[in-house]
């Protein structure tokens, strides 16, 4: 470990994010007045968003990666709706895995535009990011359009060697 540097592995980040998310969900469901638990939970999303961007670049099969996110989003929606709205289907708010699926689909679209039109990545990412943002807003996915953009920003930073595991 370097001086004044905290070295965390991908596993360390996942465990930290899962712990933060657990504290958040326990606060929401069991201790609704303990706002500090919700604040701790806010740490989870950017860590998971970073991990999704990293996973996109590290996977050997991006199509399967994106499909797995979609399957997890669909499978987890009913338990999410039951836990957070008390009904099996709540079209007004979707779980965070939808946000990550939309982001992966936008990354896939940006890659396709870059390859087919031979555009630099920032130009190819613009229409994909716009579409992802709008879809996140329309679906009312957790963290909405800005959540989708968060994953895309982490992915672009990785492309530009600004941060990676």
Question: What residues fall within each predicted segment?
Answer:
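Alpha-helical transmembrane segments and their immediate juxtamembrane cytosolic regions
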Residues: 1-165
């Amino acid at each position: 470990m370097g001086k004044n540097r905290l070295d965390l592995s991908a596993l360390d980040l996942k465990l930290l994010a899962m712990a933060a998310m657990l504290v958040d969900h326990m606060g929401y469901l069991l201790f609704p007045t303990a706002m500090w638990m919700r604040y701790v939970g806010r740490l989870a999303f950017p860590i998971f968003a970073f991990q999704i961007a990293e996973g996109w670049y590290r996977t050997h099969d991006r199509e399967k990666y994106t499909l797995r996110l979609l399957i997890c989003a669909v499978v987890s929606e009913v338990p999410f709706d039951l836990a957070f709205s008390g009904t099996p289907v709540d079209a007004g708010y979707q779980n965070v895995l939808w946000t990550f699926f939309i982001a992966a689909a936008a990354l896939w679209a940006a890659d396709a535009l870059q390859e087919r039109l031979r555009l630099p990545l920032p130009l190819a990412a613009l229409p994909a990011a716009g579409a992802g943002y709008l879809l996140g807003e329309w679906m009312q996915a957790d963290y909405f359009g800005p959540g989708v953009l968060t994953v895309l920003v982490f992915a672009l930073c990785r492309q530009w060697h600004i941060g990676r595991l």
